[in-house]
């Protein structure tokens, strides 16, 4: 596919399954605070108290991802001439989503990628040499 090379930025359209997958890893600051306060008491002469969320643990926090949402994504790998690609989707939060084997669809169907604007694929020629 013309102009499709690793490093290009395109748009990815979430479908319900991928949105749920991205959302499953996310939490909120309120949820973290509640879990940090929740502990399982220590057993006398046995196991120590267990904190539901250890201080310093990494969390993925951000706005909700839903089916139909469109996010910018960087092309990581291109699989042949059809436009099927692996993408790193930049979410609205502290994390990103790795979308694999995503097909191009000019109609912008859910679960596909498309160019950000008409003609984008022709605006950059990585083979052009400037002296």
What residue ranges belong to the model's regions?
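Short beta-strand-centered aromatic/proline hotspots
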Residues: 21-34, 55-57, 63-79
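Long intrinsically disordered, low-complexity regions that are acidic and Ser/Thr-rich
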Residues: 31-55
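Intrinsically disordered, low-complexity, charged/polar segments
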Residues: 61-71, 76-131
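Low-complexity, intrinsically disordered short peptide segments enriched in small/polar/basic residues
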Residues: 6, 10, 47-48, 58, ...
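Short, charged beta-turn/beta-strand-edge "cap" motif at the junction between a beta-strand
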Residues: 1-3, 8-9, 13-20
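Intrinsically disordered, low-complexity regions
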Residues: 29-33, 47, 99, 126-128
